[in-house]
From Swiss-Prot:
GO terms for biological process: innate immune response; respiratory burst after phagocytosis. It comes from Xenopus tropicalis (Western clawed frog). InterPro entries: Cybc1. Functions as a chaperone necessary for a stable expression of the CYBA and CYBB subunits of the cytochrome b-245 heterodimer. Signal peptide: none annotated. Belongs to the CYBC1 family. The gene is cybc1. It is found in: Endoplasmic reticulum membrane. It is a single-pass membrane protein. One of its GO terms (cellular component) is endoplasmic reticulum. This is Cytochrome b-245 chaperone 1 homolog. Keywords: Chaperone, Endoplasmic reticulum, Immunity, Innate immunity, Membrane, Transmembrane, Transmembrane helix. Disulfide bonds: none annotated.
Amino acid sequence: MYMQVESRTGTLLHLKRNPSIRSWSLLVGISSVGLAAAYYSTDTWLWKLFYVAGCAFVALQNLEDWEEAIFDKKSGKAILITYSLYKKLLTLCKGGQEQVVVLLKEIRDVNVEEERVRYFGSGYVIVLRFVTGISHPLTQSAVLGARSDVEAVAKELTKFLEFDLVGSRPQAVEESNDSESDEALDTQ
């Protein structure tokens, strides 16, 4: 699952993503190797502690982040929040949370892009495009396989931001301007 809709009202869209089952499986698998090495080794307790701590450290590095996206029309802001357990432990609970705040009026488009994921093929991620030309992914990691899940979230976000209505309006204006200019050329 790419992102789940936590809550949706006329003025608020709250999306949330938790670490995937693959991420939790890697955490358990790598931690199990450390525990097995400590249990079956004949080394001192200090080395056994090193085995467990080292594998736990590597396992936490592979754990995906918790991510939230809050789009609020009342405040006119989009807040993208990322929580990382690994960073929180490294900074002794002082860090681990990154936050990006942008104005909703600066978001120009919402796209689904394919991203290469090392060793696993390709994944999909939603990218927010801003009027300044900058692009920012909605989440830090791509989801493998199911493009339809990502497209469903992108469609929900597009509908909430009313890009489907806004996108058709300028095109209609351009068409009317083209027909007016064609009529002006015909009269000359």
